[in-house]
Structures are given as structure tokens and as C-alpha cells.
């Protein structure tokens, strides 16, 4: 038979115990942002490594860190713009709890965390694509069908990749709000 991925949603998880619940983000005009691609930050490539380097970030006198995409993407060597699962942290960087710990530590040190999110498209492994796709070969891969409430059958522009979100759709608007 054909092997396919399955999407699993974890429910009933223990909530993270945030140490800082009243962080106030800097005003936009006051932002001093340091952009981080975790994959290239250093050889460790993990959230834990960012946690361990908080003094480095503080010494830069920044007040915000922008994380290039950290959501689950296809493959392991990527900038993350080939997102497959928006609701999952990529396995390459470590567990979700470590990301939350990093955010909390940044907030304890007056540093905001900004996520670079990819909401223009999604790659073929996404269950949002697979639920409404044309699969002419029956191999689990295909393009969005006209029944898809989320995607354009054909991208409405020439500069995209993956499956193009239909941002006019109320489903997409709800999903991306």
C-alpha cells in the first residue's frame, strides 16, 4: 500500500506556565530588531541554543528578535518558507516547550519576539491541501481542487510556490486572522 502522513492534534496538554504575562511590546518606531534564522545562527540549531545565548542578545541592546519561519516545513535544510503545517513547530529546532521558554526568557529581558509567518502559500504535505486536492496518480500528492475552501486552483500571481491561499475566501480569512 501507499504510505501517507497523518495529522495528529494533541489535546488536553498541560499549559505552559508563563513567567511574564504582562509584557508590553515596544512601540513600532522604537524597535531595534535582530533577525534570526535558527538553522544558521550557529552549529547547535536549536531553541535551547537561543536560550543559552540570551546574554549575547542583551549585549546587542536590541528590543526585539524576529524568528524566521519556525513552523513545520518540508525537509530539514530550509529557510522555512516552504511551510507545511502552520500549527506545528519544526522538529529540527526542538520541542514547542523550548520555544515558549525562549519567548518567556526574552520577555523577562525586555525583548519582544516576532514571528515571520508564511501565510501566502502552503506546501503539498499540508492536510489543508490534501483534504481538497486533485490526485490523478493516487499517490497522495496533487494540486488544490476547485472544491478547496482555502486555495486557488491556480496561483493568482507568478511569484509564488506551493499551494496559493485564496485570501478572498472566508475560510482563509478566518484561518489567518
Model regions and ranges:
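Alpha-glucan (starch/glycogen) binding determinants
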Residues: 1-11
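Substrate-binding/active-site clefts of carbohydrate-active enzymes
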Residues: 14-15, 19-31, 37-177
Amino acid at each position: 500500500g501507499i504510505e501517507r502522513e497523518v495529522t495528529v492534534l494533541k489535546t488536553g496538554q498541560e499549559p505552559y506556565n508563563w513567567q511574564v504575562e504582562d509584557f508590553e511590546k515596544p512601540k513600532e518606531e522604537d524597535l531595534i530588531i535582530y533577525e534570526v534564522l535558527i538553522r544558521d545562527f550557529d552549529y547547535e540549531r536549536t531553541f535551547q541554543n537561543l536560550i543559552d545565548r540570551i546574554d549575547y542578545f542583551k549585549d546587542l541592546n536590541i528590543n526585539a528578535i524576529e524568528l524566521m519561519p519556525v513552523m513545520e516545513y518540508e525537509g530539514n535544510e530550509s529557510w522555512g518558507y516552504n511551510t507545511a503545517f502552520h500549527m506545528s513547530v519544526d522538529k529540527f529546532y526542538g520541542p514547542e516547550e523550548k520555544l515558549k521558554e525562549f519567548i518567556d526568557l526574552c520577555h523577562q529581558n525586555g525583548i519582544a519576539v516576532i514571528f515571520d509567518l508564511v501565510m501566502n502559500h502552503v506546501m503539498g504535505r499540508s492536510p489543508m491541501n490534501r483534504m481538497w486536492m486533485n490526485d490523478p496518480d493516487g499517490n497522495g500528492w496533487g494540486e488544490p481542487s476547485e472544491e478547496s475552501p482555502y486555495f486557488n486552483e491556480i496561483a493568482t500571481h507568478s511569484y509564488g510556490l506551493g499551494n496559493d491561499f485564496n485570501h478572498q475566501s472566508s475560510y482563509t480569512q478566518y484561518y489567518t486572522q
